């Protein structure tokens, strides 16, 4: 079974070293680079360039949702074979800590992330870049898979839904294999 390894690093030199170490792992079919959401375009471009310089494997770049449209073209120009739209959005809530409310921030997962992802997927698809588009975020149903494909994705990633229903990716793949495109 082919494996795509997800990597996340803020430092191009360290990322390059990691890519060089894992590049020849048997069964590894590709790499996915998660770009830092609090970084900038120059850093994103540098990370993609360094990673692609170290490998012959296809590199997918997972874009932060807020920057997806703005960074997509630069990622492809730097060597990305595919774009993953995208990373989970960030949220916050207030929790008591030693009698005082403090903010707790983190990634938001679940079906409600789908609409946010789909909006960015549509925007990136409109750029008509020469790469694969992979939808990721809030996909829990076959109908959502169809919507992502209709919006321009060639593939989907199932993230948090597998925590709740581990068999879901296989079920969706079977449905996909026997289905017709949305609208037919």
Please provide the spans of the model-predicted regions:
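Catalytic cores of alpha/beta
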Residues: 13-21, 66-81, 122-130, 139-158
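Short beta-strand/loop segments at the ligand-binding rim of alpha/beta enzyme cores
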Residues: 1-5, 52-64, 124-136
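Surface-exposed amphipathic alpha-helices with a cationic face
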Residues: 23, 48-56, 76, 121-128, ...
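Glycine- and other small-residue-rich loops at beta-strand/loop junctions that grip anionic moieties
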Residues: 7-8, 40, 61-64, 109-113, ...
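Glycine/Thr-rich beta-alpha phosphate-binding loop at enzyme active sites
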Residues: 33-43, 72-131, 168-171
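Active-site beta->alpha loop and helix N-cap motifs at the rims of alpha/beta catalytic domains
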Residues: 1-42
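Glycine-rich phosphate-binding active-site loops on the catalytic face of alpha/beta enzymes
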Residues: 29-37, 82-92, 138-139, 144-172
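Extended, intrinsically disordered, low-complexity segments
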Residues: 114, 170, 174-184
């Amino acid at each position: 079974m082919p494996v795509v390894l997800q990597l996340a690093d803020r430092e191009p030199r360290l990322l390059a070293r990691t890519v060089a170490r894992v590049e020849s792992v048997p069964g590894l079919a590709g790499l996915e680079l998660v770009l830092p959401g609090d970084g900038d375009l120059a850093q994103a471009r540098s990370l993609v360039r360094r990673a692609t310089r170290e490998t012959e494997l296809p590199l997918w770049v997972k874009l932060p949702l807020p920057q997806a449209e703005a960074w997509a073209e630069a990622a492809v120009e730097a060597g990305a074979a595919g774009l993953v739209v995208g990373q989970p959005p960030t949220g916050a809530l207030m929790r008591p800590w030693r009698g005082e409310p403090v903010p707790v921030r983190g990634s938001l997962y679940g079906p409600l992330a789908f609409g946010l992802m789909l909006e960015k997927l549509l925007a990136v698809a409109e750029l008509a870049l020469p790469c694969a588009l992979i939808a990721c975020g809030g996909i829990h149903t076959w109908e959502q898979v169809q919507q992502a494909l209709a919006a321009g994705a060639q593939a989907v990633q199932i993230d948090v839904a597998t925590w709740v229903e581990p068999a879901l990716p296989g079920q969706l793949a079977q449905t996909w294999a026997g289905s017709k495109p949305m609208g037919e």
